Amino acid sequence: NTAHHADFADRGHAHIYQEGIRIPPIRLYRAGELMNDVQELILLNCQVPRERLSDLRAQMAANRLGVERVRALCDKYGRDTVLAAGRALQDYAERKMRAGIASIPDGTYRFSDRFDNPEMDGDMEFSVAITVKGDEMHLHFDSPPQVRAGINMVFTALLSTVYYAAKTVVDPTIPPNSGLARPLTVTATEGTVLNCVHPAAVNGRIAPCQRVVDLIHGALAQAVPERVIAACSGVCASATFIGDDPGTGKLWVYLETIGGGSGARAGKDGLDGVHVHMTNTSNL
């Protein structure tokens, strides 16, 4: 699973080596036993390790609950039935995505937007060309070369954004699983802001993710305007606060993400002060 840990401090965002500790895929538990040396290495890089330890334990509790629920399903219905149901759900998501795409008129729909450039005065331009043909959709993105700032995004972040945004327009009732991705193809030039390569900084990638949703919505609004909401706040702002507790003298760290607002829908106004799109939304 994924969780936010507030105080892995960074020293800037010129490249990924400045963005705090990097942890490869490693086992925190092995055969149910805590690998204490791994945990200590992680906590040593925190300013408030007692809080981060609670975060880690919460993540592991969520994993254990997930394992228990899957085992309970297998015990009740049998492993083969559970696996078959999973495959059927993926196939169902694919069918719904294809049916939804087929309801959009064939054609190529283009849209571009601007994004603040952290390296120099002026803006960067992002653009998308969405080609709908039958029950398939291809999305191609153009953006400037990756920058020495944390707003670059790796290709997997672009993919998850595309899957979310396409689902919201094509058919919001599609189950969120890999089946919905089968009719979609995505391309973007390597080494650009929207498809960066090592050692690009990526800590603030949620900001361009939000703008990519705006791109997709802007393009598809030309074909099915009744299905697309107006542009939302277009960013995810966050602030980290740190200080000493006057009662205990202990250090504390607090991270808060700040919601902007959602755009109007076809028949309703938007909402104020809420998170939108690639923030607290159920993503793949």
Question: Residue locations for each model-derived region?
Answer:
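Glycine/proline-enriched, intrinsically flexible loops and inter-domain linkers
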Residues: 1-136, 142-284
